[in-house]
């Protein structure tokens, strides 16, 4: 017997190409007709006239033949198109009865089919999304909560089959009564073996003038055990009168994948806390904590706390803490870095987040404290760096404490720099954080430098003591009138004392230091760098670069902060770590611009073989344009974490001001994830863009993009930073959340693409859009594309909420493949943002699947006076179900169409509900 195989999509593509070719030829013929069908004779003689008539006749004959050919071409294209449609219809007619007969007994016995997607919960009901078929299928999306005195909770997304993505949680309903509470977002559904967890639903808004609290974002769904990304937590709900809702926690990773990113806190008088990052899988890193919400109302404006980073799996690194939210009076405290897994072989603890800026418009206030660095595993690995304290017009925030290393080997985390104070003579800089304790072999962490200010500078943090082999950490240098911290002692067997170490009472230790000074002297004279020892830190206010660590081992010195002035000067770069082991120094903060622009933060120093990159310096605060944050330092080639990008500087006047952009996260080594991008600074006119996440190492994931800065009541929020691309075998990083703004919310950052040769890695999720008071809210970022086999495209980010404008559109889900040889699941489209009096945002389209895999579900439209449209479900190709269409924002709206099922096996996706 002979068989004929037809692929309708290939036939349709060929028909499109032929139609384009026909249009091109027709255009060329029309252009040539005037010059070839009626030629003028070259002269008045009969021969010239005859030649002109002959060529004109040839031209007219050619045009007549071309018209016949064009007509034939059109009929051929029509036949090809009709034939492809006939093949598709015939296959659908043949497959549907077969699937129905297969599913019927399983559905009757268990309540769920063998192959097929779960049904969506209806909008406005908070109904659960249905569970997918046992074998192949995506979970249905949870229904949105109802609008009322207290908003109704969104429904949880349905669970996936063995192969499929979990459904997205439904958005919480809006609370309208005084003291009402917005509905909680529904939890995302979990995947089983291969597939991504669903994103948590956004918390509902509270729109009353008295006492309303935004709803809590939903928890992200867990990733598939063998492949797929964990779901991101939903953003907390907006509050017009009191506290924004807390962001939802990220979902847990699978065996090899990173935990989901925590949701951003909601905007309010007091910003909501960011959600905690999800726990990493067995070999995966913890997810990054969500950024704290913007505290936006006058003297009550307090930024929300950043979420803590998720703990690493048994063998994974800890997640980075989220940045504290900025506040018009007081900045929010940053989240702490997550601890690495107990048995990790060199994985580092997560870095603490940067504290939120305080007193950005009204003059008073204090910056938020930087988060503490996470601890390494039991035996090996370096501690995470402490976060930088936030800028405060009255007082800078304290830097975070560095994390402790493993007991046998690893360096202590560097303490965070104290936040800068304002230019007034009564202002105070924040104290630097203490450096962390190392293992038996490793350097003590450097103490953070004290923060600059127009009044009293901050004191420096103490350096950590070495144990057996390693240098003591540098004592942090105090700013103007602030004392420097004590340096740590060198190791008992070998190691130099850190800067400003106290006098030892041990004769052996003093003799050891004299011998090291003698050994280092010729090397320093020849190269400007010791053999064993730390680099010197730059003095605050000078912008000097930190010195490089010793050639064998040593930490790089911290860069000095830039000087304040009309335009602030740039901070110094951190010094490089030693060749064998050593941490890169932190970049210095940019100087405050008292009547102009803030100085740029210095870049963090890079490690070489074993060690973590330094954190980029925070951009200087300013009256016009905040300084750009410094880039994070690169991780060591073999072991160590990449440095975080520095946060952009904020603006502390109510005029035309723009926040500085966050710095790019550092690049990873072979096995480490890229560093997270810095948060954008706050500005009255426009918040700064978040920094892009750093590129992942050869076998590791890209870093998370930084959140966009917040804009003022008539300004725009900054765009979230793009997620870093995965290494050759790694997953893409998640995009950062967009900043909040009165007139326009910032768009969420796009997710990073997975590496080209990945076997199970997924594209990064897009960031959520920022909220807006009276304009259009930010759109969710598009999800990144998946890797080679079994990965999922990243989910699109949810659109932001708008009180009196238009809700943000949901981001498009990432594709499960780029070329026809790839397989994987399409990412789900993000949900459109809701609006109280305007139009809801449209849901994002689901991503197209690879050769084998389900299409992504379309995102639900946002609720509003005019309903947002549901996004279309993505198509499957050979084997797999089409994605479900997204629900309309409310009854009477337009729902999204379901995607087409696979040619060989798979059901069409269900249409969304209205």
Swiss-Prot record:
Residues 895-904 have a biased composition (Gly residues). The keyword Repeat applies. It comes from the Bacteria. One of its GO terms (cellular component) is extracellular region. Residues 1-93 form the PE domain. Residues 412-431, 895-914 are annotated as: Disordered. InterPro entries: PE-PGRS_N, PGRS_rpt. Keywords: Repeat. Pfam families: PE (PF00934), PGRS (PF21526). Belongs to the mycobacterial PE family. PGRS subfamily. This is WAG22 antigen. It comes from Mycobacterium tuberculosis (strain ATCC 25618 / H37Rv).
């Amino acid at each position: 017997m002979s068989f004929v195989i037809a692929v309708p999509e290939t036939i349709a593509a060929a028909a499109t190409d032929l139609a384009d070719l026909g249009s091109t030829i027709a255009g060329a013929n029309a252009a040539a007709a005037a010059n070839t069908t009626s030629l003028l004779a070259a002269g008045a003689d009969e021969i010239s006239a005859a030649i002109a008539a002959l060529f004109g006749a040839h031209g007219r004959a050619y045009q007549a033949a071309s018209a016949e050919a064009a007509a034939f071409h059109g009929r051929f294209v029509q036949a090809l198109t009709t034939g492809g449609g006939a093949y598709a219809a015939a296959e659908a007619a043949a497959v549907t009865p077969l699937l129905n007969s297969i599913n019927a007994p399983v559905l009757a016995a268990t309540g769920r089919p063998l192959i097929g997607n779960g049904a969506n919960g209806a909008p406005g009901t908070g109904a659960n999304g249905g569970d997918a078929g046992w074998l192949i299928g995506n979970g249905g999306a949870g229904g949105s909560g109802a609008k009322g005195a207290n908003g109704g909770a969104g429904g949880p997304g349905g669970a996936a089959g063995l192969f499929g993505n979990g459904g997205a949680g439904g958005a919480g309903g809006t609370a309208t009564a005084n003291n009402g509470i917005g509905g909680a977002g529904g939890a995302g559904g979990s995947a089983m073996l291969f597939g991504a967890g669903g994103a948590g639903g956004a918390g509902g808004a509270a729109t009353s003038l008295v006492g309303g609290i935004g709803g809590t974002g939903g928890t992200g769904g867990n990733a598939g055990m063998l492949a797929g990304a964990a779901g991101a937590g939903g953003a907390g709900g907006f509050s017009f009168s009191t506290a924004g809702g807390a962001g939802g926690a990220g979902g847990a990773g699978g065996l090899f994948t990173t935990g989901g990113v925590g949701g951003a806190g909601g905007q309010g008088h007091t910003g909501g806390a960011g959600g905690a990052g999800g726990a990493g899988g067995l070999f995966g890193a913890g997810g990054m904590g969500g950024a704290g919400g913007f505290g936006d109302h006058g003297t009550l404006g307090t930024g929300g706390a950043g979420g803590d980073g998720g703990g690493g799996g048994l063998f994974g690194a800890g997640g980075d803490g989220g940045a504290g939210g900025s506040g018009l009076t007081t900045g929010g405290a940053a989240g702490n870095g997550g601890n690495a897994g107990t048995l990790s072989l060199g994985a580092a603890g997560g870095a603490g987040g940067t504290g939120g800026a305080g007193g950005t418009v009204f003059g008073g206030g204090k910056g938020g404290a930087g988060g503490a660095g996470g601890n390494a595993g039991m035996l090996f690995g370096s501690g995470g760096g402490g976060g930088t304290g936030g800028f405060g017009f009255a007082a800078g925030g304290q830097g975070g404490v560095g994390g402790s290393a493993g007991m046998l080997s690893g360096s202590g985390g560097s303490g965070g720099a104290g936040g800068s104070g304002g230019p007034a003579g009564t202002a105070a800089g924040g104290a630097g954080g203490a450096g962390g304790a190392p293992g038996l072999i490793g350097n003590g962490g450097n103490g953070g430098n004290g923060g600059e200010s127009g009044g009293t500078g901050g004191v420096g943090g103490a350096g950590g003591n070495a144990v057996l082999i390693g240098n003591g950490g540098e004592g942090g240098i105090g700013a103007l009138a602030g004392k420097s911290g004590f340096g740590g002692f060198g190791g008992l067997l070998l190691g130099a004392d850190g800067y400003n170490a106290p006098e030892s009472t041990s004769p052996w230790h003093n003799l050891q230091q004299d011998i090291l000074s003698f050994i280092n002297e010729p090397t320093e004279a020849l190269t400007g760098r010791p053999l064993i020892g730390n680099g010197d830190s730059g003095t605050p206010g000078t912008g000097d670069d930190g010195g490089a660590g010793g050639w064998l081992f040593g930490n790089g010195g911290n860069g000095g902060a830039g000087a304040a002035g009309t335009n602030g000067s740039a901070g110094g770069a951190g010094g490089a770590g030693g060749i064998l082991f050593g941490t890169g120094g932190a970049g210095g903060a940019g100087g405050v611009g008292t009547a102009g622009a803030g100085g740029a933060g210095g870049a963090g120093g890079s490690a070489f073989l074993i060690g973590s990159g330094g954190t980029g310096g925070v951009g200087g605060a300013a009256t016009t344009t905040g300084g750009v944050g410094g880039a994070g330092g690169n991780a060591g080639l073999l072991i160590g974490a990449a440095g975080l990008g520095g946060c952009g500087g904020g603006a502390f006047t109510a005029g035309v001001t723009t926040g500085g952009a966050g710095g790019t996260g550092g690049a990873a080594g072979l096995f480490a994830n890229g560093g997270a991008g810095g948060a954008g600074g706050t500005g009255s006119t426009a918040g700064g863009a978040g920094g892009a996440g750093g590129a992942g190492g050869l076998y590791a994931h890209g870093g998370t993009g930084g959140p966009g800065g917040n804009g003022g009541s008539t300004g725009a929020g900054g765009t979230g930073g793009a997620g870093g691309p995965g290494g050759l075998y790694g997953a893409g990083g998640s995009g950062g959340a967009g900043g909040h703004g009165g007139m326009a919310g910032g768009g969420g950052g796009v997710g990073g693409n997975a590496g080209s040769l990945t076997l199970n890695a997924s594209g990064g999720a897009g960031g959520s859009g920022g909220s807006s008071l009276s304009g259009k809210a930010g759109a969710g970022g598009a999800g990144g594309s998946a890797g080679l086999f079994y990965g999922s495209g990243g989910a699109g980010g949810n659109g932001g909420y708008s009180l009196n404008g238009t809700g943000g559109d949901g981001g498009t889900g990432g594709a499960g493949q780029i070329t026809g040889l790839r397989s994987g699941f399409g990412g789900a489209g993000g949900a459109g943002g809701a609006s109280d009096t305007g139009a809801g945002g449209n849901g994002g389209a689901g991503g197209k699947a690879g050769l084998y895999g389900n299409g992504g579900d379309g995102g639900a439209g946002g609720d509003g006076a005019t309903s947002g449209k549901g996004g279309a479900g993505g198509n499957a190709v050979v084997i797999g179900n089409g994605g479900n269409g997204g629900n309309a924002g409310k009854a009477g709206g337009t729902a999204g169409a379901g995607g087409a099922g696979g040619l060989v096996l798979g059901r069409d996706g269900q249409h969304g509900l209205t």
